[in-house]
């Protein structure tokens, strides 16, 4: 059996899977991204996880595909990821290749990887144009146009989370203010809800009462 290892690096968790040629996930493994405070120590955890999956799976591993925030497809590096403690430019492809010995190791932005997966195996198989929006520790999007993934000149097309939504708004991990993901992401949704409640509490409560009234 031929298979590949898929890696999804998030700001909170890192998830891995053994995937066959049909796109079926045969095995899963995960660990906390937040258990590591720098790139070198994180790579030790990732290498250990990849090695565990390959050693416990019969067949031939054809390579590793990695989806990560600010993953640069062209350079094989994770660049300036606000929610990861990796620094300016983390050479994840080169580091993993040297450790596990696989030639075919590829990196892309996590939302781009999700969009490509939908195009090949999921709901986008019969669509030529669509956008996948990912919501987790951050906010991202992957864009398919004319059946092809849009990478952009520098590999960062579709960085929806860092579009300015509120001028001079909340401080983002990227250093700018008002980025969309500071208002709409897993770790910021509660803050947005709290601010909304304080700003217009009376109308919010009235709306809730109306909703419950209709349900009766």
Show where each model-derived region lies:
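Short glycine/serine/threonine-rich phosphate/pyrophosphate-binding segments
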Residues: 13-15, 113-115, 138-140
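Short, basic/aromatic recognition patches
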Residues: 2-3, 128
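Short glycine-rich, Thr/Ser-proximal phosphate-binding strand/loop in the N-terminal lobe
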Residues: 3-44, 77-79, 155
């Amino acid at each position: 059996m031929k298979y590949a290892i898929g890696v999804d690096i998030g700001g909170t968790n890192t998830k891995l899977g053994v995937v066959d040629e049909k796109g079926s996930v045969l095995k899963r493994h995960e660990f906390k991204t937040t258990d590591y405070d720098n790139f070198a120590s994180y790579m030790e955890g990732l290498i250990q996880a990849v090695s565990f999956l390959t050693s416990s799976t019969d067949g031939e591993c054809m390579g590793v595909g990695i989806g990560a925030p600010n993953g640069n497809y062209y350079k094989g590096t994770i660049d300036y990821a606000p929610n990861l403690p990796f620094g300016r430019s983390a050479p994840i492809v080169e580091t993993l290749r040297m450790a596990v010995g696989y030639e075919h190791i590829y990196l892309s932005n996590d939302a781009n990887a999700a969009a490509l997966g939908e195009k090949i195996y999921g709901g986008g198989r019969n669509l030529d144009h669509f956008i996948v929006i990912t919501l987790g520790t951050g906010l991202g999007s992957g864009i398919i146009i004319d059946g092809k993934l849009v990478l952009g000149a520098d590999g960062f097309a579709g960085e929806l989370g860092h579009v300015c939504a509120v001028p001079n708004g909340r401080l983002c991990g990227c250093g700018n203010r008002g980025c969309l993901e500071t208002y709409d992401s897993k770790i910021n949704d509660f803050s947005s809800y709290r601010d909304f409640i304080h700003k217009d509490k009376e109308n919010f409560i009235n709306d809730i009462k109306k909703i419950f009234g209709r349900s009766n």
